[in-house]
Amino acid sequence: MLFRNSLVFSVPLWIALKALKWHLLLNSYWKESSFSLALNSFLCGFSFGLITPGKVGELSRVLYLPFENRGDGIGLIILDRYCDLIALLFLAVFGVTHFAGFLYGFLVFLSGAIAASLFFLFPHLLELLCRQNKFASISNYMNHLRKIPPINSDVFFRVLVISFSCFVVSVATSFSLLLSFGDAPLSTALTVFPLTLLTNVLPITIGNLGVREGATIYLLGQYGLEKEVAFHVSILLFVLHSVIPALLGSIIQPFTRAGRKVKDSQLDRKATNI
């Protein structure tokens, strides 16, 4: 019963953390953004992301924002996913060290540190690229990025912490699922599940089906666990933290009025000009 309650609770907790992270990013650019707006935008975009390789469909989050310049939100989505990658790299250090050795674990840690530092170097790199780029189309895109107000370091670190927390919830949920099939040491969760989550960044299949299950079966097999158990744990986590949020997003899509609000504001402006 305890395992069942923790698994059920993990779904709204995971969704709330994801929406809170998105709200922090939105509020850093559009101060009038609310948590409910961020929640609706995240869930609707997530439902499209699930059916596209590499979750590219999550860029559709901006379609559910009631702002005329909502296209600027694409940069925020990229930053959101970038923070996820950094958090995963740090979380995967223990597993990489366990399976591949200290040197590879250190390289993964170093990669995470470099990726985090690039956030602070990005404005300077952008200025350099804008001055030296000879391709007009790319230069125009770079100039467009320069117009977007930079995210301050406080927001970046808070988003990074929430990203890390989301993955901790996923790892804890996976471990709870594993315990429902039998006993397993905590070290199993700390070494295996961050690595299986890291496969989500590979844009190979829709929903990453097959890749994640294969990685879970192989890694848990190193601890002598049966393939059937590993497969069921992977599929159940996919249902809890992917299918259910995507279904919720699909349900609320018809009731999302963001696009209509944008159109209404444009019509009001035209009427005022007339």
Model-derived features with residue positions:
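Membrane-interface alpha-helices at helix entry/exit sites of multi-pass transporters
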Residues: 35-37, 69-82, 226-236
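Interfacial segments of multi-pass membrane proteins
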Residues: 64-71, 192, 214-229
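Transmembrane alpha-helix interface/packing and boundary motifs in multi-pass membrane proteins
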Residues: 47-53, 194-213
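Membrane-embedded alpha-helical core segments of multi-pass
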Residues: 17-18, 52, 56, 87-95, ...
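Extended non-transmembrane interhelical loops and adjacent amphipathic helices
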Residues: 39-67
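Predominantly cytoplasmic-facing regulatory/coupling regions of multi-pass membrane proteins
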Residues: 1-43, 97-201, 233-235, 239-274
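Hydrophobic alpha-helical transmembrane segments of ABC transporter permease domains
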Residues: 78-100
